[in-house]
Amino acid sequence: MSYAQTRTQTKAGYKAGVQDYRLTYYTPDYTPKDTDILAAFRVTPQPGVPYEEAAAAVAAESSTGTWTTVWTDLLTDLDRYKGRCYDIEPVPGEDNQFIAYIAYPLDLFEEGSVTNLLTSLVGNVFGFKALKALRLEDLRIPVAYLKTFQGPPHGIQVERDKINKYGRPLLGCTIKPKLGLSAKNYGRAVYECLRGGLDFTKDDENINSQPFQRWRDRFLFVADAIHKAQAETGEVKGHYLNVTAGTCEEMMKRAAFAKELEMPIIMHDFLTGGFTANTSLAHYCRDNGLLLHIHRAMHAVIDRQKNHGIHFRVLSKCLRMSGGDHIHTGTVVGKLEGDKDITLGFIDLLRENYIEENRSRGIYFTQDWASMPGVMAVASGGIHVWHMPALVDIFGDDAVLQFGGGTLGHPWGNAPGATANRVALEACVQARNEGRNLMREGGDIIREACRWSPELAAACELWKEIKFEFEAVDTV
């Protein structure tokens, strides 16, 4: 067949030009399928752009559409593959914002790939000129897609069985200063914190392998500290060894060395490291019996602005699919951003198996995790012993309460700082189990415990005036 004949035949069923997105991608009569991936976008259109057109543009640009009609549309079934905006909902109190609900057929996404999922949903559309701002508020991941992911390497119950600790939150500490310590001094700080009563210590997010402390030296000194602390206390101890590196090959080499040293847990910066690297590491951890702690470094660049970016509840869901046993979630009461209701919403999305839609907590869709293991929430950032009652009340048992400055800043040193936190935690758990109200009686509970612990009394005196009372930027 000649070129001229081909050109004539395509003309018969094809009309070139630009048409409104809403003619194809706005389908208010559509009923989402159980297998659809559903997305809730907060859309701020440019002045003069109708809501239906802006919403349809998001559906088009995040699925099959482009700016003009193309004749190759005739070579596929667009009705099968296109994203569809099926509902629009105004945002209360905002004149020019609305929530666009979009359904995507499952065929658009590669199985087991968070990287491909996000590349489609948020990879290009956020730069679209017709929009002033765009934020992905929530996703509903269907069971059919979830079953293509391994998820967390182990999950909450398996972790507790590995470390033999039940009925209370776990205690951690980020070693400070985060940069500048030699490997030997770093190991010393780890040992002091663990023998003082903590369950875990932690590399900070930006400790990798710098001139003042190469990764192999740090791993060796930390391993010595853990083995010594375990022998002295009779408890399983751990340190989150950060294996994040410049290449996946180097990252896996560091993970393998941690396993060789019989370390129970390693760590990854999942956003700066990337989802492909994180998923690979999670698979390695399951195969080799390592727990995987996840740091969310860079998250606020993506999630803090209320009208643009990706909400952390979406990043949390993506992390649970990609794989991690812990992830930092904020504290509500500490120095980092976090509205209480929203924080509790995405903590449930990390830990629970089935979560009902609850708009007061920012949950737009009911999510069934199909028995995928849960992720333990990590409360970290500006917390100290006076926060302990609120933290136990807010987070419950399946969490790691991580006191960095709140341990290492103790006036008597690292080990007494760890002891102060352990005593405060044990006092709060006992009081809760006896039926006392931690939010109302928390101060009294801590003061009573000070009578039996000079380490706790010294910590309480030091931090009695320290508060972080700022209004949350991101609210429902």
UniProtKB/Swiss-Prot annotation:
Its cofactor is Mg(2+). Its EC number is 4.1.1.39. Signal peptide: none annotated. PROSITE patterns: RUBISCO_LARGE. Coiled coil: none annotated. Binds 1 Mg(2+) ion per subunit. One of its GO terms (cellular component) is carboxysome. It catalyses: 2 (2R)-3-phosphoglycerate + 2 H(+) = D-ribulose 1,5-bisphosphate + CO2 + H2O; D-ribulose 1,5-bisphosphate + O2 = 2-phosphoglycolate + (2R)-3-phosphoglycerate + 2 H(+). SUPFAM superfamilies: RuBisCo, C-terminal domain (SSF51649), RuBisCO, large subunit, small (N-terminal) domain (SSF54966). The modification N6-carboxylysine is found at K202. The record marks K335 as: Transition state stabilizer. One of its GO terms (biological process) is photorespiration. It comes from the Bacteria. The active site is at K176 (proton acceptor), H295 (proton acceptor). It is found in: Carboxysome. It holds the Pfam family RuBisCO_large_N. Keywords: Bacterial microcompartment, Calvin cycle, Carbon dioxide fixation, Carboxysome, Disulfide bond, Lyase, Magnesium, Metal-binding, Monooxygenase, Oxidoreductase, Photorespiration, Photosynthesis. GO terms for molecular function: magnesium ion binding; monooxygenase activity; ribulose-bisphosphate carboxylase activity. Belongs to the RuBisCO large chain family. Type I subfamily. RuBisCO catalyzes two reactions: the carboxylation of D-ribulose 1,5-bisphosphate, the primary event in carbon dioxide fixation, as well as the oxidative fragmentation of the pentose substrate in the photorespiration process. Both reactions occur simultaneously and in competition at the same active site. Heterohexadecamer of 8 large chains and 8 small chains; disulfide-linked. The disulfide link is formed within the large subunit homodimers. NCBIfam families: PRK04208.1 (NF003252). HAMAP family: RuBisCO_L_type1. The basic functional RuBisCO is composed of a large chain homodimer in a 'head-to-tail' conformation. In form I RuBisCO this homodimer is arranged in a barrel-like tetramer with the small subunits forming a tetrameric 'cap' on each end of the 'barrel'. This is Ribulose bisphosphate carboxylase large chain. The gene is cbbL.
